[in-house]
């Protein structure tokens, strides 16, 4: 009988005990031990095996249940190495902040107290050995009677009492260290969160004589904001680093082996199109979450729906500019996007457009196609799965859910422009907030139209702000089959509703006067519809011919 698939299980011991299919990543333990740095931060996208690897480190190093844990590494790579002598040698603290998210700072304070109380409850056995003062401190943390200010020292306190119990330094593992910081950024209380976590992390990780090693995981490296500015003993390994490149994610060889095991090796090229394409250092890797889902359900679709990542995409769309639209368009047309990537994110202010792309890269929504020099890279969409997620997010922002978009696009491609105008007007009135359409926000309308373009991407190529004739047109939908009809659109906004029709006619005249159809005709397209589109708030008028 074939092994089961441990979908959603990120506890290493459970995966092994339940005899689930496991790709041996225990070489990571050997690399961690050989790595001389005291504190290591691994930045990888969500669902790339960070928690499973942390859980593996916990079971490997933990002095508690040493013999029992030794068994779970039987026949794995690490068992046959010199590094295996480190198994079961240290007390371990494993704190996951994955679910530490809150809408307000007050709620976050409560969540922090609960998370630390839960952590301490795993070490209640230490109470037997503590003096009165330490017992009081421990019990107050357990009962959530401690001021938040005092909790900044909680992890260091725990390392001390563990050291005193075992006379061994402590391994500290903090999973998803940045989850509460991203939540604070999205919900507007970042400075308060930063002040707490900066001290919370540095007290345990810096100048701590009870610390053997610290390992943190997250998506981003929040360093400009000063979270780790005090840590001079920190080594950071991001997706741009040349070490630990295959510790997270699956290599092609590992994916082929898994497909073969389940008798579906013929799917490799489809699987590659959908889930491959990530570049970590010099290794090309697949998204492990999606591969596990595919092995389970044997269906090619987007499995990697990640709410916090989608919040970031929505953030990009919220602050959308004409430049963002054009960049997204290039990405959707399969082109690369040149960007300066510093590898750090400053969440203390609204992200600049450049930093948004960086965040998208570290979150797994873009990947590196080519390194130009030290900080400059060409980025692209990694695969079909991510492309599908962008499209879905785009469509929901502009068109809501349901079949509105389908009917709208049918009207356009069948050249029923009056019906197209009516349907677009309805979408503007029902799906779009006033802020999006306020005066002069042409970028929003570009986004709206681009969403339509994405919908047509199988049969059409969409382009915006490209030189043709005597100027630059706003938007063109060009058919791949040159016998079909093309559409040239020019947008103008006005704050005078009575001038709506007049402005739409001006836009139409501009298309003709500036000969925007030249490049289409050169490409062999004969049938072209010219559309001048005028907006005033949520009102629209299209003049066409």
Listing of model-derived features with the role each one plays in the protein:
Residues 1-441, 456-463, 482:
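Phosphate-binding site recognition
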Residues 420-545:
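Structural signature of nuclease core domains in nucleic-acid processing machines
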């Amino acid at each position: 009988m074939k092994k089961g698939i441990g979908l959603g299980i990120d506890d290493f011991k459970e995966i092994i005990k339940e005899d689930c299919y496991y790709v041996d990543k225990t070489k990571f333990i050997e690399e961690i031990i050989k790595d001389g740095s005291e504190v290591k931060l691994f930045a990888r996208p969500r669902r790339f095996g960070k928690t499973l690897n942390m859980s593996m480190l916990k079971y490997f190093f933990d002095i508690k249940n040493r013999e029992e844990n030794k068994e779970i590494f039987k026949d794995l790579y690490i068992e046959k190495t010199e590094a295996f002598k480190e198994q079961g040698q240290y007390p371990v603290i494993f704190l996951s902040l994955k679910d530490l998210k809150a809408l307000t700072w007050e709620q976050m304070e409560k969540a922090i107290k609960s998370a630390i109380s839960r952590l301490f409850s795993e070490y209640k056995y230490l109470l037997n050995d503590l003096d009165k003062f330490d017992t009081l401190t421990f019990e107050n943390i357990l009962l959530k009677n401690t001021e938040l200010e005092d909790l900044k020292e909680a992890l260091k306190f725990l390392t001390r009492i563990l050291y005193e119990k075992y006379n061994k330094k402590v391994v500290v593992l903090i999973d998803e260290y940045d989850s509460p910081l991203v939540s604070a950024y999205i919900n507007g209380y970042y400075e308060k969160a930063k002040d707490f976590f900066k001290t919370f992390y540095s007290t345990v990780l810096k100048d701590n004589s009870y610390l053997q090693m610290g390992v943190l995981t997250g998506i981003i490296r929040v360093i400009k904001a000063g979270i780790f500015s005090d840590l001079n003993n920190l080594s950071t390994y991001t997706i741009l680093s040349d070490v630990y490149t295959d510790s997270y994610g699956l290599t092609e060889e590992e994916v082929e082996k898994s497909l073969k095991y389940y008798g579906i090796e013929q799917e490799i090229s489809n699987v590659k199109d959908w889930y491959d394409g990530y570049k970590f250092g010099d290794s090309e890797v697949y998204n492990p979450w999606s591969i596990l889902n595919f092995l389970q359900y044997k269906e090619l679709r987007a499995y990697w729906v990640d709410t916090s990542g989608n919040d970031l995409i929505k953030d990009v769309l919220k602050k959308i500019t004409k430049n963002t639209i054009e960049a997204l368009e290039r990405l959707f047309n399969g082109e690369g996007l040149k960007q300066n990537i510093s590898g750090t994110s400053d969440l203390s202010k609204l992200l600049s457009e450049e930093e948004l792309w960086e965040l998208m890269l570290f979150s797994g929504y873009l990947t590196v196609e080519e390194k130009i020099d030290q900080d400059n890279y060409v980025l692209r969409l990694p695969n079909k799965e991510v492309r599908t997620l962008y499209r879905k997010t785009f469509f929901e922002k502009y068109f809501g859910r349901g079949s509105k978009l389908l009917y709208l696009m049918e009207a356009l491609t069948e050249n029923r422009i009056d019906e197209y105008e009516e349907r677009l007007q309805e979408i503007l009135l029902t799906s779009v907030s006033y802020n999006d359409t306020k005066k002069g926000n042409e970028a929003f309308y570009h986004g709206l139209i681009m969403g339509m373009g994405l919908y047509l991407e199988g049969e059409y190529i969409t382009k915006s702000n490209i030189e043709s004739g005597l100027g630059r047109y706003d938007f063109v939908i060009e058919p791949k089959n040159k016998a079909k009809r093309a559409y040239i659109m020019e947008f103008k906004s006005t704050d005078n509703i009575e001038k709506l029709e007049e402005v739409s006619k001006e836009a139409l005249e501009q298309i003709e006067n500036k000969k925007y159809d030249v490049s289409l005709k050169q490409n062999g397209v004969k049938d072209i519809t010219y559309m001048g589109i005028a907006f005033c708030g949520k009102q629209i008028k299209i003049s066409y011919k």
